[in-house]
């Protein structure tokens, strides 16, 4: 068979369930470097679109790389359509974005994509910062999230700090965090999963709160003391996998949290500074 036929017969195009748009590292387990293997462990196909490409996270003594140029980034997205690789697409997830212009490019691509995929699940992890570090992305990214991605998302997964930035509301107690999350809900944005709500410090618990228009569910997990990076990226990968495998939202959140705890403990047992995925036991 000629190479011309092999690479131009679109009926042969590789298909994916998920397009994951976020950071990638050469060394380490953050962004798509942890999300892609986690999604594949769940038996789903995924295309990874990088927003930044780094040697490793900046927490090490040295790191190299940076944001993907807009021309490349838009080309990566466009190529998936040119290859006719999105016929079976079910979800798009976003994580760490390198620039506000990437967010705008992505939003334009998603808007066009939804015309052919009206049931597409768009899940946004609005990576902005955290309480300990403050904002650790470019200062124009929060407004870009508000303007371009939140209006397209069906679900978002902010931590408490990110929820405060997106809403401009104080969220340091559970009731105020829930109220802030509800203020973001719309005809499009159906749910908010708050990934670091106030937990019980004495009982070493942390809480994840699932907020929708008609329900609020608080899920408590054991708190694991760790400096491991990429746990939020892993959580989102597990969450989207659970949803696509037919789990209800709250159940998918609960299972995702348990999987993250399992991975963290497994990693600690192996004395690694980077997350290690153990085999996935099918529940």
Swiss-Prot record:
Pathway: Cofactor metabolism; pyridoxal 5'-phosphate salvage; pyridoxal 5'-phosphate from pyridoxal: step 1/1; Cofactor metabolism; pyridoxal 5'-phosphate salvage; pyridoxine 5'-phosphate from pyridoxine: step 1/1; Cofactor metabolism; pyridoxal 5'-phosphate salvage; pyridoxamine 5'-phosphate from pyridoxamine: step 1/1
The keyword Metal-binding appears for this protein: yes
Pfam families according to UniProt: Phos_pyr_kin (PF08543)
Domain of life: Bacteria
Residue numbers binding Mg(2+): 136, 162
Binding residues annotated for ATP, in chain numbering: 125, 157, 162, 195, 221-224, 231
GO molecular function, one term: pyridoxal kinase activity
Needed cofactors: Mg(2+)
Keywords: ATP-binding, Kinase, Magnesium, Metal-binding, Nucleotide-binding, Transferase, Zinc
A Gene Ontology BP annotation from the UniProt entry: pyridoxal 5'-phosphate salvage
Protein name (record): Pyridoxine/pyridoxal/pyridoxamine kinase
Organism, scientific name: Escherichia coli O1:K1 / APEC
Gene this protein is translated from: pdxK
